[in-house]
Amino acid sequence: LFRSEIHINRQAAEVLNSDKAISLLPIGITAIEGEFEKDDIVRIIDFEGNTVGVGKANCNSLQAKEAMGKHGKKPVVHYDYLYLE
């Protein structure tokens, strides 16, 4: 169903699982598996390999890989389009 996965670190997982409305930023991404285009639905996987949820990509996989791990970049998944399990 979901061709692509975005893997996130512990800190990103904790923030996403908090009560705050927060977008998935590139700084919290550790790996990207598969390719996706902007607006594709991607699965979000935590540091232990568990599915955290799904979201609509704000960019394509190439742009996400370039921004991965960096500060001050646009969200890869905006919180309005983030569905947590």
Labelled PLM ranges:
Residues 3-85:
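Beta-strand/loop-dominated core regions that host nucleotide or nucleotide-derived cofactor-binding catalytic loops
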